[in-house]
Amino acid sequence: MIERKHVSARMSKIVKHNGVAYLCGQVGNAGDSVADQTSECLSRVDALLEDAGSSREKMLQAVIWLADMSDFAEMNAVWDAWVPEGYAPARACGEAKLARPELKVEIIVTAACD
């Protein structure tokens, strides 16, 4: 069975199937620093993980898009502090033109769920 949560015409914020939660991409507040945007993204990920019956410790994969790879270290400092030790997911990070020019980071997470 597929369960969709927070559904709009364009997307669902959470899709659950066979014990896996797929979260839509999360962005931070436009105009903030990369660190601030990353922190906001991860706060939103936390909320969606909880809503999906999951947690940081159950993350399977993360895909991170940066508008500029020169922000990699700044984003990683926030990410590294957020991920529980010993529970790092499979992860990829690349550079992409994001939906709005003021956005600097977008994070997409997949996690095991109840």
Segments and roles (model prediction):
Residues 1-60, 66-114:
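N-terminal presequence-like segments and the immediate start of the first folded domain
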